């Protein structure tokens, strides 16, 4: 059966008090609406339409990589009106449509799939996603007749029996497309708000003797975000969910409450993560690593057995058994080999570092290719920028760079070379050479006494 989805994402969200449309606020590094789109895709629904309104162009810009279509709701006149705006998307289609809100990022793909499967298997015209909660105050109650849903009653309209019902409407649905389109034509805005409500479609379907069902899910999954406090709550639940998955997969997270891991991160078993670490984007971390406190790793690949201490690694690759930090900065497009030492206050930018090389402290390497088994003394600087352009430096295998050396790019240091401490290298250093580029030391005897500095 054909399946499609509509995501309601047109509202500004005034209570969140932001210039940014509400659905573009991020939960664990990803826009809320993109969490929902991904849930649809992972539930095997590829045909997704996003209802846009406030900040429409920005929402399109932030979701364009998701390959979705859009319908414009120029005026926000209720959820029913939002779906009416997707009429062109729905017309000509057969099968079922799932309708979800773009501000509920905790929804799981398996829940979406189960809702659609339940709808199809029970041959319903509409199937509601519902939850059972202890305190349903403020929520629309689900009134059932056996397994079938009779109606949704808003809290303020409940009678004595209905007020006791704990099953509530989550505001997420699956509809038979033909039945939905027919019902939308009958929707009225004859109410105090002058809006069209999607919940009224249920009443219309029941009057037409159509079958309406419901599927209960965990209330946490259905939480919507209307304020910064609710966003923080949702993100806390999501972080806990992510961390629990890694724990269950054999990763040690010493303090999950103080560890931030985004949803697309992959971590190998027997890796240990100390508090204060931030792991973002599509980072992949191997097995048997140790992440000591307070590092940030973004969109990077970390090999097996790597140790990282209080450092920042961005868009780079770190090889097996390498150590990084403390206080190292590995900038984008760097490729660090295996068994490498990147020590304290070392900055690597857009460079390749060969296996078994040591860059132990207070060094800057930018736009360079460094061979294997090299050693960098303290205070080495690759001078890669002339004020207009960046230039490349090449350092061969088995080279020894003495302390306080300046390598002025573009320059090449061949294999098996030594550079004396304090040198400023501006020309090629031949293989097997010792390069010395510094002023000759001169001692002036009696100078201090003559100047009466003592």
Swiss-Prot record:
MF GO annotations: glucosamine-1-phosphate N-acetyltransferase activity; magnesium ion binding; UDP-N-acetylglucosamine diphosphorylase activity
Cofactor(s) for this UniProt protein: Mg(2+)
Residues binding Mg(2+), per UniProt: 103, 226
Stored Gene3D superfamilies: Hexapeptide repeat proteins, Spore Coat Polysaccharide Biosynthesis Protein SpsA, Chain A
Pfam families on file: Hexapep (PF00132), NTP_transferase (PF00483)
Pathway(s) annotated for this protein in UniProt: Nucleotide-sugar biosynthesis; UDP-N-acetyl-alpha-D-glucosamine biosynthesis; N-acetyl-alpha-D-glucosamine 1-phosphate from alpha-D-glucosamine 6-phosphate (route II): step 2/2; Nucleotide-sugar biosynthesis; UDP-N-acetyl-alpha-D-glucosamine biosynthesis; UDP-N-acetyl-alpha-D-glucosamine from N-acetyl-alpha-D-glucosamine 1-phosphate: step 1/1; Bacterial outer membrane biogenesis; LPS lipid A biosynthesis
Residues that, per the record, bind UDP-N-acetyl-alpha-D-glucosamine: 8-11, 22, 73, 78-79, 140, 154, 169, 226, 331, 349, 364, 375
Binding site for acetyl-CoA: 384-385, 421, 438
Residues the record marks as active site: 361 (proton acceptor)
Catalysis performed (reactions): alpha-D-glucosamine 1-phosphate + acetyl-CoA = N-acetyl-alpha-D-glucosamine 1-phosphate + CoA + H(+); N-acetyl-alpha-D-glucosamine 1-phosphate + UTP + H(+) = UDP-N-acetyl-alpha-D-glucosamine + diphosphate
EC nos: 2.7.7.23, 2.3.1.157
One GO cellular component term: cytoplasm
Top-level taxonomic group: Bacteria
GO biological process: one example: regulation of cell shape
Primary location class: cytoplasm
Region annotation (Linker) ranges: 229-249
Cofactor note: Binds 1 Mg(2+) ion per subunit.
Compartments, as annotated in UniProt: Cytoplasm
Ranges where the record places region N-acetyltransferase: 250-454
Family recorded in the similarity comment: In the N-terminal section; belongs to the N-acetylglucosamine-1-phosphate uridyltransferase family.
Role, per record: Catalyzes the last two sequential reactions in the de novo biosynthetic pathway for UDP-N-acetylglucosamine (UDP-GlcNAc). The C-terminal domain catalyzes the transfer of acetyl group from acetyl coenzyme A to glucosamine-1-phosphate (GlcN-1-P) to produce N-acetylglucosamine-1-phosphate (GlcNAc-1-P), which is converted into UDP-GlcNAc by the transfer of uridine 5-monophosphate (from uridine 5-triphosphate), a reaction catalyzed by the N-terminal domain.
PANTHER family to which the protein is assigned, alphabetical: BIFUNCTIONAL PROTEIN GLMU, NUCLEOTIDYL TRANSFERASE
Description of how the protein assembles with itself and partners: Homotrimer.
Protein name, as recorded: Bifunctional protein GlmU
Species for this entry: Clostridium perfringens (strain SM101 / Type A)
Phylogenetic classification of the source organism: Bacteria, Bacillati, Bacillota, Clostridia, Eubacteriales
